[in-house]
C-alpha cells in the first residue's frame, strides 16, 4: 500500500460528436498519472493532453478499457504528446480494435480531420495496473462477456466502470444481442454493488450526474426494463418508443434505436 493519496478527475467528452456522453478519467498521485480511456476525437485528445500537462504529473499509463472508437480514437494525439507513456488494453480489446479499426473509420467518416490517422500500439494487459504503489484491480471479463472489464481501486473505493456503466443514458445493448449476454452483464453489476464503492465512473453519462453507485443501479434497472419491453414490442421501432417513454430524459437516443433493431433481429452490429 502506498502512502500517497490519489485524485480522480472525470471529463465529459464527445460521443457522438457534439454530445458530451463519454467519460475519461485522469488519476493522479504525487508524481505520476494514469489515464483511463482516450476519447473519441482528436480534439478531445488535445483537451486531455492539456489537462495532463496542467496536472504537472508524468503520464505513465493509458488504459483503453474497451474496443469501441469513443474509447481510443483520441489516443494518437496523447501518444504524440507523451511518447514515454504505455498504452494498455486487454488482449481481446486489442484484437477487436485491430479488426474493426478500418470499418470504424469509414462509419465515422463525417468526423473528417477529427479522425485518427493511425492506430496507437497497445500492449496487452492481463493483470492489475498500479500507480505509485496503488493497485487498480482488473475485474470482470467473465466467460459470457470476456471483453468487458472494469477497474477497482480498493483503498479509495473507486470503481471505473467503462462500457459496463451508463448514467442517465440509453444503455448501448447492440453488442450484447442475446438475453444470456445481458444476464451476464447484470451479474457483473451485482458484483460491482457488492464492492460497496464510493466513487463510480460510468463510461457514458450525462454531464452533471453523480459519480456514485447510482450508475450501477441505473444500468441494472435499464437492462431489466429492456427485457420487459423487448418481450412486448412487435418490432424495433416500438421497442425504441417504449424505452423513450420509460426514460424520457436519457441521452444517447442512438443506443435505444440501434439496440432495439439488433435485439429484434432487424439488423446486425459488429
State where each predicted segment sits:
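Conserved beta-strand hairpin/beta-sheet module of binuclear metal-dependent hydrolase folds
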Residues: 3-54, 150-162
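Short Pro/Gly-enriched beta-strand edge/turn motifs at strand-loop
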Residues: 4-13, 108-111, 130-135
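Short acidic-hydrophobic surface loop/beta-edge motif
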Residues: 27, 126-131
Amino acid at each position: 500500500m502506498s502512502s500517497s493519496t490519489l485524485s480522480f478527475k472525470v471529463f465529459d467528452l464527445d460521443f457522438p460528436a457534439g454530445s458530451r456522453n463519454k467519460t475519461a478519467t485522469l488519476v493522479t498521485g504525487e508524481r505520476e498519472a494514469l489515464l483511463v480511456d482516450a476519447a473519441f476525437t482528436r480534439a478531445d485528445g488535445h483537451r486531455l493532453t492539456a489537462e495532463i500537462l496542467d496536472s504537472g504529473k508524468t503520464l505513465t499509463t493509458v488504459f483503453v478499457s474497451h474496443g469501441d472508437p469513443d474509447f481510443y480514437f483520441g489516443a494518437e494525439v496523447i501518444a504524440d504528446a507523451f511518447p514515454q507513456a504505455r498504452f494498455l488494453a486487454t488482449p481481446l480489446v486489442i484484437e477487436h480494435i485491430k479488426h474493426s479499426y478500418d470499418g470504424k473509420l469509414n462509419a465515422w467518416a463525417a468526423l473528417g480531420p477529427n479522425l485518427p490517422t493511425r492506430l496507437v500500439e497497445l500492449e496487452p494487459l492481463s493483470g492489475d495496473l498500479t500507480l505509485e504503489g496503488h493497485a487498480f484491480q482488473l475485474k470482470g471479463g467473465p466467460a459470457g462477456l470476456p471483453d468487458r472489464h472494469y477497474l477497482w481501486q480498493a483503498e479509495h473505493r473507486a470503481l471505473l466502470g467503462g462500457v459496463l456503466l451508463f448514467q442517465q443514458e440509453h444503455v448501448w445493448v447492440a453488442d450484447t444481442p442475446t438475453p444470456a449476454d445481458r444476464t451476464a452483464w447484470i451479474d457483473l453489476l451485482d458484483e460491482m454493488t457488492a464492492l460497496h464503492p464510493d466513487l463510480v465512473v460510468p463510461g457514458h453519462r450525462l454531464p452533471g450526474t453523480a459519480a456514485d453507485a447510482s450508475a450501477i443501479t441505473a444500468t441494472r434497472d435499464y437492462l431489466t426494463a429492456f427485457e420487459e419491453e423487448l418481450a412486448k414490442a412487435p418490432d424495433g421501432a416500438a421497442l425504441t418508443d417504449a424505452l423513450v417513454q420509460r426514460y424520457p430524459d436519457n441521452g444517447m437516443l442512438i443506443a435505444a434505436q440501434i439496440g432495439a433493431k439488433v435485439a429484434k433481429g432487424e439488423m446486425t452490429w459488429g
